[in-house]
Amino acid sequence: MSRVGKLPVAIPNGVTVTVTPDNVVTVKGPKGELVKAMSNKINIAVEDNSVVVTRDNDHKDVRALHGLTRALINNMVTGVNEGYVKTLELVGVGYRAQLQGKKLVLSLGFSHPVEMEAVSGVEFEVEGGTKVKVKGIDKELVGAVAADIRKWRKPEPYKGKGIKYENEVIRRKEGKTGKK
């Protein structure tokens, strides 16, 4: 039995979970609604304030899907109830972020500003010009948008300049030593 998959997903107050016969899970909550199609190899049932995920057989691929399905449903329930936030920090001289409507404009040392449109389901928040918060109810989408922002200037190991996640530790390197 999957250690993750055998745990039921608790449904908090204000959140409703519905499962169609073809395993399409719909989760509605105070922050919005998420719909996701799950594998038909897994059984999903809503039983008194919890979602129970079970499997029919012990094939390797079904065992893998068991824990995955439970984790995805848990992420959906948490997302519509609390939401997800990824915080990025811009480290470097002249590296700035600002909002223009729903568009995020980054100055990252290029000859042009980098503009990113907010994807539906994700919103940006800028604090002090050097911190960008990516907020949304879909964990996968929030992480993907944050990774797209970080991709423009990954932190470099010598001075630590670039865009990094808030709690990310940059492994630093020693520079070259001069000739004597």
From Swiss-Prot:
PROSITE patterns: RIBOSOMAL_L6_1 (PS00525). InterPro entries: Ribosomal_uL6-like, Ribosomal_uL6-like_a/b-dom_sf, Ribosomal_uL6_a/b-dom, Ribosomal_uL6_bac-type, Ribosomal_uL6_CS. Pfam families: Ribosomal_L6. GO terms for biological process: cytoplasmic translation. One of its GO terms (molecular function) is rRNA binding. The keyword Chaperone does not apply. Disulfide bonds: none annotated. The keyword RNA-binding applies. One of its GO terms (cellular component) is cytosolic large ribosomal subunit. Part of the 50S ribosomal subunit. PANTHER family: 60S/50S RIBOSOMAL PROTEIN L6/L9 (PTHR11655), LARGE RIBOSOMAL SUBUNIT PROTEIN UL6M (PTHR11655:SF14). This is Large ribosomal subunit protein uL6.
